[in-house]
Amino acid sequence: MDNKIIVALDYETENEALNFIDQVDPSLCRLKVGKEMFTTLGAHFVKQLHDRKFDVFLDLKYHDIPNTVARAVRSAADLGVWMVDLHASGGLTMMEEAKKILEPYGKDAPLLIAVTVLTSMEDLDLLQIGINASPMEQVIRLSHLAKRAGLDGVVCSPQEVEVLRTHCGDDFKLVTPGIRPAGSDFGDQRRVMTPKQAIQTGADFLVIGRPITQAQEPLSILKAINASIA
């Protein structure tokens, strides 16, 4: 299955989420479960998505001491998720140990992806936490570190895709939030791009939330987005 669309579930209740999920098709998208929904609904919710044949990106952005992160990544693998992420700013050792713990899973291991710079952050935001670099510079730095650790790819804004292809190669997966279909509200993400533009720059997977989940006819929107990037 070569779905490029990952739908970010942003519902407050299980019933709302399942109502949406039952309107869409696992052949058209994968699903992202983040901190809010996982904290509220837990592993049982992920299993329900698997029962409906959806691949799941468990977006918990682990960032802790290496042993703790590695064990959390192993738990995600045991849950059967398709992709899981951690913060590259946790360091090389943390990422290496997380990757190593997945070795026994072989081809069944989830993709391990690093978060570089959150798409809501700009130069001033980085400066305020002691990083005297532009978002692009920091993304490149952390992406190199993730590749060195053996990770499968990174989360990055669409504007960084072309540069990262040059730095990290074609086999390095680029997962891009900040995707808004033409005419959509930008919401809380500042570095945005349309699905067609993002794919044309070389993105592998597109994370899209509210333009699909809050649509009156989500299946129609999802089909239209897929058609635009075909």
Curated annotation (Swiss-Prot):
Binding site for substrate: 10, 32, 59-68, 119, 180, 189, 209-210
A GO CC annotation given for this chain: cytosol
Disulfide bridge map: none
Catalytic reaction equation(s): orotidine 5'-phosphate + H(+) = UMP + CO2
EC assignment: 4.1.1.23
InterPro entries xrefs: Aldolase_TIM, OMPdecase, OMPdecase_AS, OMPdecase_bac, OMPdeCOase_dom, RibuloseP-bd_barrel
Keywords: Decarboxylase, Lyase, Pyrimidine biosynthesis
Pathway: Pyrimidine metabolism; UMP biosynthesis via de novo pathway; UMP from orotate: step 2/2
Enzyme class of the recorded protein, top EC level: lyase
Molecular function as annotated in GO: orotidine-5'-phosphate decarboxylase activity
Domain of life: Bacteria
GO biological process: 'de novo' pyrimidine nucleobase biosynthetic process; 'de novo' UMP biosynthetic process
Catalytic center residues: 61 (proton donor)
Family assignment from sequence similarity: Belongs to the OMP decarboxylase family. Type 1 subfamily.
Function in brief: Catalyzes the decarboxylation of orotidine 5'-monophosphate (OMP) to uridine 5'-monophosphate (UMP).
Subunit structure as annotated in this protein's UniProt entry: Homodimer.
Descriptive protein name: Orotidine 5'-phosphate decarboxylase
The species this protein was found in: Haemophilus ducreyi (strain 35000HP / ATCC 700724)
